[in-house]
């Protein structure tokens, strides 16, 4: 009976060591993950995308239409973002990209990150869509209404802030694309269609 406590302590020691090793391993993995520049960029991109579509979605009034009929439809308060397909496109694309970044962050955390080629392709497609709608939105924002000192986004602060974050996200995405391309190149562009392989040999990047 007297040996039972000692035997119990001896039995616990291996378990405590395993738990300690597991906690230490998890801490080390998280430390390495946070030192990964691509992962840190991903966190920032996720936050910026969330800010972009949230601010644009908050623009429920204040926008002016370039046509008198639009002004009459919206009244003195002005139009919401839903009256403009360009702004709706920004909300849709950036909301989709934010969802993608959340999934990607989870995959990094569980150490199931996609290959660089997949990341590059997805980032390139999202960035192209972002750039298209942001350019159209900026053009629409700057459109003159009635007089030269009155433009579509003059009283639309949320939209202006949204487009600033949208442009910054595109810049960061381009840097991530370049980083993913370099990683893919180190893997000899595995998975790239043969028709494009000649381009990578000529222009390795």
Swiss-Prot record:
Give the family from UniProt. Answer: Belongs to the Casparian strip membrane proteins (CASP) family.
Stretches in topological domain Extracellular: 58-89, 146-159
The protein, known as: CASP-like protein 0U1
Q: Which GO terms describe its cellular component?
A: plasma membrane
Between which residues do disulfide bridges form? none
Where does the chain cross the membrane? 39-57, 90-110, 125-145, 160-180
Task: Name where it's found.
Answer: Cell membrane
Query: Where mainly located?
Result: membrane
On whether Zinc is a keyword of this UniProt record, the answer is: no
Q: How does it sit in the membrane?
A: Multi-pass membrane protein
- Which keywords are on file for this protein? Cell membrane, Membrane, Transmembrane, Transmembrane helix
Cytoplasmic domain ranges by topology? 1-38, 111-124, 181-205
Assembly mode: Homodimer and heterodimers.
């Amino acid at each position: 009976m007297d040996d039972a406590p000692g035997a119990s302590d001896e039995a616990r020691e291996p378990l405590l060591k395993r738990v300690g090793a597991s906690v230490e391993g998890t801490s080390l993995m998280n430390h390495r993950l946070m030192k990964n520049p691509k992962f840190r960029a991903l966190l920032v991109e996720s936050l910026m995308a969330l800010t972009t579509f949230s601010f644009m979605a908050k623009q429920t009034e204040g926008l002016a239409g370039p046509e008198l009929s639009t002004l009459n439809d919206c009244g003195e308060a002005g139009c919401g973002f839903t009256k403009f397909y360009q702004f709706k496109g920004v909300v849709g694309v950036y909301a989709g990209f934010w969802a993608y970044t959340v999934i990607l962050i989870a995959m990094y955390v569980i150490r199931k990150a996609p290959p660089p080629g997949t990341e590059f392709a997805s980032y390139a497609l999202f960035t192209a869509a972002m750039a298209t709608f942001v350019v159209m939105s900026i053009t629409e924002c700057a459109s003159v209404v009635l007089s030269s000192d009155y433009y579509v986004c003059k009283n639309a602060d949320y939209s202006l802030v949204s487009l600033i974050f949208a442009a910054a996200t595109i810049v960061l995405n381009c840097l991530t694309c370049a980083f993913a391309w370099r990683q893919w190149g180190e893997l000899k562009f595995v998975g790239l269609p043969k028709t494009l392989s000649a381009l990578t040999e000529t222009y390795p990047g």
